[in-house]
Amino acid sequence: MPGTSVSDLSTATAVDAPALLPLPVARPSAPAVVRGKLYIKTHGCQMNEYDSAKMADVLAASEGLELTDNPEEADVVLVNTCSIREKAQEKVFSQLGRWKALKAGGKPVIIGVGGCVASQEGEAIVKRAPYVDLVFGPQTLHRLPELIRARRESGKSQVDISFPEIEKFDRLPEPRAEGPSAFVSIMEGCSKYCSFCVVPYTRGEEVSRPFEDVLVEVAQLAAQGVREINLLGQNVNAYRGAYGADAGDPAQYADLGLLIRTIAQIEGIGRIRFTTSHPLEFSDSLVDAYRDVPQLANCLHLPVQAGSDRILSAMKRGYTALEFKSRIRKLRAVRPDISISSDFIVGFPGETEADFEKTMKLIEDVGFDQSFSFVYSRRPGTPASDLQDDTPETVKQARLARLQAHISAHAASISQSMVGSVQRVLVEGPSRRDPNELTGKSENMRPVNFPGNPRLIGQFVDVLITEAMSNSLRGRIQLDDSAH
């Protein structure tokens, strides 16, 4: 039921949708008085980008800090870290070493380390870099104002890397839209414990935000002009959002499919995406959402990691290559032209040439559009870090190059096949290449550049694709026949 107003959601009847209380519509809040400058450097995933935006919101609301692109003029400098790749810790300490000079002459700059490296290292960061004032984890970013005040009052570095369930979302200010597309975190952590991954140790186990809390945030963003919602989670399709307990009844739980159906009813929301998924949790309910919800973007990022069952077992992924392909077949039965992207780890300990060929066979069978692919990176403290790894680095790099070349060639053929088609594009702003043109993204995440009036920014337009290039598409706005 697209176009349903937020206040009508209490009577909306999507398939299996629960009765909802009316959701508040966002009203612009008075801007905070600017009392200082904030600089944030972000490494890693979209979840970190979301968290950094929330850090900025928290500190703007509580401390009056305004973002700056120059750390030298900032009163608070934060690095939001990622521990997925090798040598992440050393990169953080290199960054901190450069920032140490910011305190020269006794300037009272607050230096903070957040994110997953902070969760892993904790007090060790302060011991190695005693000029660091704050160390906080992904689940405690909402406590930044208290940590800053405690640091200033006590003169001692503050460390808080606890996992206080979902508390941080209850204490975040109203979201602020920064363009027509926005991220909304719907859950935190992961309980899959893949043998190569640090996420369960740095972000904790899976905790879902309450169903109605997510809807409130989406409604607030929609009221500010957001038209595309990107639902975020480390294992987003494991979402189980509680609802209904406030009425005295036992809580019920909404899965991702139901959440998508309900978000699609919120006025103004024209496109929904989600990331990152786990194949084990890719349910029939989600396939049905792809069948029934036109706002759900015609693309999916579903990390498979490898095509060899032996390697998948060693990774503790919980599925086989055949089971993965079965899920893709179900999805393509309802969305035949859906774009599929994935993650791959090349050179996992014990990977043979035969194992790698099975990965290449899977890639050929599925026809992936894009990939995030890397050579295996040993992460301390994970089960895989104890496995013997005797494959030469040159072999791993050669395999990676072959895999990436294959997927890139297929992606190029998909782009070429889009020439002559009409694509629905959300206009994001002026093109970087040519400020006299507009740019936006197609449903399958292709940047599209085209001539157009800046008044179209924030709207969906139909664009006839006229040219495919290596990393983008060109086109022209397709006028409705009724306009002639």
Curated annotation (Swiss-Prot):
<feature type="domain" description="TRAM">
    <location>
        <begin position="416"/>
        <end position="479"/>
    </location>
</feature>
<keyword id="KW-0819">tRNA processing</keyword>
<dbReference type="Pfam" id="PF00919">
    <property type="entry name" value="UPF0004"/>
</dbReference>
<comment type="function">
    <text>Catalyzes the methylthiolation of N6-(dimethylallyl)adenosine (i(6)A), leading to the formation of 2-methylthio-N6-(dimethylallyl)adenosine (ms(2)i(6)A) at position 37 in tRNAs that read codons beginning with uridine.</text>
</comment>
<dbReference type="InterPro" id="IPR005839">
    <property type="entry name" value="Methylthiotransferase"/>
</dbReference>
<comment type="subunit">
    <text>Monomer.</text>
</comment>
<dbReference type="InterPro" id="IPR013848">
    <property type="entry name" value="Methylthiotransferase_N"/>
</dbReference>
<feature type="region of interest" description="Disordered">
    <location>
        <begin position="428"/>
        <end position="450"/>
    </location>
</feature>
<dbReference type="GO" id="GO:0046872">
    <property type="term" value="F:metal ion binding"/>
</dbReference>
<feature type="binding site">
    <location>
        <position position="45"/>
    </location>
    <ligand>
        <name>[4Fe-4S] cluster 1</name>
    </ligand>
</feature>
<keyword id="KW-0411">Iron-sulfur</keyword>
<protein>
    <recommendedName>
        <fullName>tRNA-2-methylthio-N(6)-dimethylallyladenosine synthase</fullName>
        <ecNumber>2.8.4.3</ecNumber>
    </recommendedName>
</protein>
<keyword id="KW-0408">Iron</keyword>
<dbReference type="GO" id="GO:0035597">
    <property type="term" value="F:N6-isopentenyladenosine methylthiotransferase activity"/>
</dbReference>
<keyword id="KW-0479">Metal-binding</keyword>
<keyword id="KW-0808">Transferase</keyword>
<dbReference type="InterPro" id="IPR002792">
    <property type="entry name" value="TRAM_dom"/>
</dbReference>
<keyword id="KW-0949">S-adenosyl-L-methionine</keyword>
<feature type="binding site">
    <location>
        <position position="82"/>
    </location>
    <ligand>
        <name>[4Fe-4S] cluster 1</name>
    </ligand>
</feature>
<keyword id="KW-0004">4Fe-4S</keyword>
<feature type="domain" description="MTTase N-terminal">
    <location>
        <begin position="36"/>
        <end position="153"/>
    </location>
</feature>
<dbReference type="Pfam" id="PF04055">
    <property type="entry name" value="Radical_SAM"/>
</dbReference>
<keyword id="KW-0963">Cytoplasm</keyword>
<dbReference type="InterPro" id="IPR020612">
    <property type="entry name" value="Methylthiotransferase_CS"/>
</dbReference>
<dbReference type="InterPro" id="IPR023404">
    <property type="entry name" value="rSAM_horseshoe"/>
</dbReference>
<dbReference type="InterPro" id="IPR007197">
    <property type="entry name" value="rSAM"/>
</dbReference>
<feature type="domain" description="Radical SAM core">
    <location>
        <begin position="176"/>
        <end position="415"/>
    </location>
</feature>
<comment type="similarity">
    <text>Belongs to the methylthiotransferase family. MiaB subfamily.</text>
</comment>
<dbReference type="InterPro" id="IPR006463">
    <property type="entry name" value="MiaB_methiolase"/>
</dbReference>
<feature type="binding site">
    <location>
        <position position="116"/>
    </location>
    <ligand>
        <name>[4Fe-4S] cluster 1</name>
    </ligand>
</feature>
<dbReference type="Pfam" id="PF01938">
    <property type="entry name" value="TRAM"/>
</dbReference>
<dbReference type="GO" id="GO:0005829">
    <property type="term" value="C:cytosol"/>
</dbReference>
<feature type="binding site">
    <location>
        <position position="190"/>
    </location>
    <ligand>
        <name>[4Fe-4S] cluster 2</name>
    </ligand>
</feature>
<dbReference type="GO" id="GO:0051539">
    <property type="term" value="F:4 iron, 4 sulfur cluster binding"/>
</dbReference>
<feature type="binding site">
    <location>
        <position position="194"/>
    </location>
    <ligand>
        <name>[4Fe-4S] cluster 2</name>
    </ligand>
</feature>
<feature type="binding site">
    <location>
        <position position="197"/>
    </location>
    <ligand>
        <name>[4Fe-4S] cluster 2</name>
    </ligand>
</feature>
<dbReference type="InterPro" id="IPR038135">
    <property type="entry name" value="Methylthiotransferase_N_sf"/>
</dbReference>
<dbReference type="InterPro" id="IPR006638">
    <property type="entry name" value="Elp3/MiaA/NifB-like_rSAM"/>
</dbReference>
